[in-house]
């Protein structure tokens, strides 16, 4: 049995907000009608609609709009959503000016969130939530969620640990090979550069901006490091990595990545044996769908913590397992009342318990906790769960009804020359660096953590699919999602364009904002050519006047957010942003239950 077996789903336009999830819904067993009567599948505006009806599950409908918290005029499509929410600013930090992502990142995340809402609604119905369920989300809500760590840091009272300035990988060897470098500790970083003959001062100064690039989306590295790379061959770069403990990965083209696996961006595998005891109690009527369920999270960095955070927003009780002394990222600057603003963006509202999972006593304690949990979620390095005796089979022996969730880098599909499964390395290996930039920009992974965040969303979706299957089939379930699945979902439109004989990459200047007298504006994709043609007569105007002039011509456009610290005062979106008890900025939930 599959989670959505015997579930019919009507899907209506716009395609940009629905297409990313159709294959996933089919892989989960749903019967899809993507062209309901009277609905144009190519309609450019929303909201999109996913209406699910299942035997003994009732009806659940998810609506997805471009603008759910932003005014319609400021969130007309992918380009304007990226501009208004600050996504263009964050992606452009490496280059020193706002740049639009050439992939439909906000729309893809919104579509994934819509599927999560459907799964959560159906799960709630199966668990006893009364009445029909309707929920709404938006590409703007999705964008704010993906930017939540950057927004929290920008609006904290402390400064960043390193200055924000243009720069960053990839590096380029003497033969022209662009490559990403990964070193999670200063030792491998220093040994790598010393093996290539880099100056000691540059090695020392470069470590901190390189280390913090995941947090800041930029890395102003000393020029001598780039010069060192340009002076040596790719073969020597690889030798230096092998001898130092660092890892390198060439920036691959999209054509260098094998075909995506069919079946969606995750796997959902039920156990063979049915569970004899009741799985869990029904929720009180009108409660959130996951109320009464416990999620045990042993996550680090972004992917698993974000997945658990989303499950918490849907009502689950999340218990986070931290090492003795607590998660060191709790103190990562900038802080709000001594707690990292970035950490709060992913872990707000979770309970925490310190356990030494490397010790037999800690492993035994964690197994005892798993015996009473509904979900166990982790993103440990490959093989670690087995070494600790905390793999799916071992935990199933203490809790046969457990949903065991692994959010990984490469899933079970190691690619040739695949490096460690971190965000920028997966971007480099899978062609995301090429897809994310138009044809007049050199391929380069975005320093915005595109895959960690989308991978976290997919992890939450996989857990919801597993919980629904467990509820319907009465069996424990193992689910796995990955950064690789996130990369393939994000690059699928480019791959499909190439299969149809069209250009994989977007044209020169695609989603590049237009400069005004005091800032930048972004036209919608549909209005971009006309806006560029008339813009020479408007570029000396202030941004608000230039936007108004374009709108007077019937062209959609909005101002580009270039300062995340100013967003709470921005009348377009400020009312949707709040503060927690620490004073840290909080973005709105990605869902509204109607």
Language-model region placement:
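N-terminal glycine-rich dinucleotide-binding loop that anchors FAD/FMN and/or NAD(P) in oxidoreductases
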Residues: 83, 336-356, 428
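Hydrophobic acceptor-binding patch used for acceptor engagement in glycosyltransferases
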Residues: 376
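Glycine-rich, N-terminal phosphate-binding loop of Rossmann-like dinucleotide-binding domains
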Residues: 299, 356-357, 379-380, 429, ...
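Structural alpha-helical scaffold elements that stabilize or flank donor/cofactor-binding regions
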Residues: 368-369, 418
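Flexible glycine/proline-rich, aromatic-decorated loop/lid segments
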Residues: 82, 422-437
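Acyl-CoA thioester-binding alpha/beta core of soluble enzymes
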Residues: 1-76, 83-326, 335-336, 340, ...
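Glycine/threonine-rich flexible loop motifs
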Residues: 52-53, 363, 380-391, 416
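An anion/phosphate-binding loop that grips the pyrophosphate of nucleotide cofactors and donors
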Residues: 373
């Amino acid at each position: 049995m599959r989670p959505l077996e015997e579930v019919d789903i009507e899907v209506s336009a716009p395609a940009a907000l629905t297409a990313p999830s159709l294959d996933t819904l089919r892989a989960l067993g749903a019967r899809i009608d993507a062209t309901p009567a009277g609905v144009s599948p190519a309609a450019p505006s929303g909201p999109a609609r996913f209406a699910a009806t299942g035997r003994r599950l009732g009806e659940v409908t998810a609506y997805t709009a471009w603008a759910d918290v932003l005014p319609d005029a400021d969130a007309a499509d992918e380009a304007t959503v990226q501009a208004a929410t600050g996504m263009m600013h964050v992606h452009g930090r490496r280059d020193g000016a706002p740049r639009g992502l050439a992939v439909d990142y906000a729309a893809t995340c919104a579509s994934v969130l819509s599927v999560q809402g459907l799964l959560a609604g159906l799960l709630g119905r199966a668990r006893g939530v009364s009445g029909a369920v309707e929920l709404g989300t938006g590409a703007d809500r999705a964008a704010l969620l993906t930017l939540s760590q950057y927004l929290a840091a920008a609006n904290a009272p402390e400064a960043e640990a390193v200055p924000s300035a243009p720069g960053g990988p990839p590096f380029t060897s003497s033969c022209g090979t662009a490559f990403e470098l990964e070193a999670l500790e200063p030792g491998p970083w220093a040994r790598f550069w010393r093996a290539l003959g880099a100056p000691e001062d540059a090695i020392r100064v470069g470590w901190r901006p390189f280390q913090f690039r995941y947090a800041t989306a930029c890395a102003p590295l000393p020029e001598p490091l780039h010069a060192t790379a340009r002076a040596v061959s790719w073969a020597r770069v690889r030798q230096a990595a092998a001898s130092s403990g660092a890892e390198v990965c060439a920036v691959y083209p999209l054509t260098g990545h094998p075909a995506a696996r069919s079946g969606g961006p995750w796997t959902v595998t039920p156990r063979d044996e049915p569970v004899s005891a009741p799985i869990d109690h029904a929720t009180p009527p009108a409660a959130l769908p996951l109320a009464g369920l416990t999620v045990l999270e042993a996550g680090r960095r972004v992917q698993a913590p974000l997945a658990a955070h989303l499950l918490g927003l849907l009502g689950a009780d999340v218990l986070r397992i931290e090492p003795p002394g607590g998660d060191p990222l709790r103190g990562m600057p900038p802080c709000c009342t001594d707690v990292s603003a970035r950490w709060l963006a992913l872990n707000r509202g979770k309970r925490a318990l310190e356990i030494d999972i490397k010790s037999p006593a800690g492993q035994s304690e964690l197994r005892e906790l798993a015996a009473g949990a509904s979900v166990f979620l982790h993103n440990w390095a490959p093989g670690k769960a087995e070494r600790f005796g905390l793999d799916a089979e071992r935990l199933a022996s203490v809790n046969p009804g457990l949903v065991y969730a692994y959010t990984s880098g490469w899933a079970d599909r190691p690619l040739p020359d695949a490096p460690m499964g971190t965000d920028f390395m997966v971007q480099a290996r899978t062609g995301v660096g090429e897809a994310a930039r138009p044809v007049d920009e050199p391929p380069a992974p975005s320093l915005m953590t595109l895959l960690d965040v989308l991978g976290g969303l997919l992890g939450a979706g996989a857990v919801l699919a597993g919980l629904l299957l467990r509820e319907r089939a009465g069996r424990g379930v193992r689910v796995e999602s990955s950064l690789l699945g996130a990369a393939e979902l994000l690059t699928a439109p480019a791959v499909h364009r190439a299969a149809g004989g069209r250009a994989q990459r977007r044209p020169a200047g695609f989603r590049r904002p237009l400069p005004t007298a005091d800032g930048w504006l972004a036209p919608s994709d549909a209005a971009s050519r006309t806006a560029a043609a008339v813009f020479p007569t408007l570029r000396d105007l202030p941004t608000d006047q230039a936007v108004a002039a374009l709108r007077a011509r019937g062209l959609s456009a909005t101002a580009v957010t270039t300062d995340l610290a100013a967003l709470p005062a921005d009348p377009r979106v400020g009312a949707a942003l709040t503060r927690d008890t620490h004073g840290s900025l909080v973005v709105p939930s990605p869902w509204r239950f109607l």
